[in-house]
Amino acid sequence: MREVFTMWRHTQMVVLVALTAAIYAATLIPTQFLPIIPGFTNVRPANVFPFVFGLLFGPAGAWGAAVGNLINDFFGTLGLGSIGGFVGNFFLGFLPYKMWSSFFRRGEDIEPNLASRKKLVVFLAIVVLASAVCAVWIAWWNDLLGFVPFAALAAVITVNNALAGLVLGPIFMVLLYPRIRRWGLLWTEIM
């Protein structure tokens, strides 16, 4: 967890936060007009990015997801619920890189690529788990504030997040991983 704070000492990681936030916000904003629960969540195919950027860029991907979601909220859903969205989206990017290595034994190849069936299954499992954690946090916060019932919001956000990651995640990982690695931008190479 320390890397979440120490990453700010690395210029490349700070740039990756800005890049990730910009890409996430720029792809979230156009779907603001497709609400599922008006004022709280909408159809979000862009939710693929926290999983992919979290796994590739580590803590920079997590911070980028949080900031990108907050920027998106300025375009129609900004309010006290945005605090829950900030934290929930942080975890959407944080959990993929934190959980990835826990699925592999010592000495096993833990490169964040989907080059084996096991890695694909692990990626898909992480997408579902991170989606649920994000949804629980956001739904709990909004229920605490009295905005939306927990069960309804948690179910919608979990499915919405997971669908984007399950369908688009493997495609983006296969396309981006080789390039990110070649450019030396994997978080494990920077920090």
Language model regions located:
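Hydrophobic transmembrane alpha-helices
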Residues: 2-63
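Membrane-embedded alpha-helical hairpins and interfacial helices in multi-pass inner-membrane proteins
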Residues: 29-48, 71-191
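Central hydrophobic cores of alpha-helical transmembrane segments
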Residues: 62-72
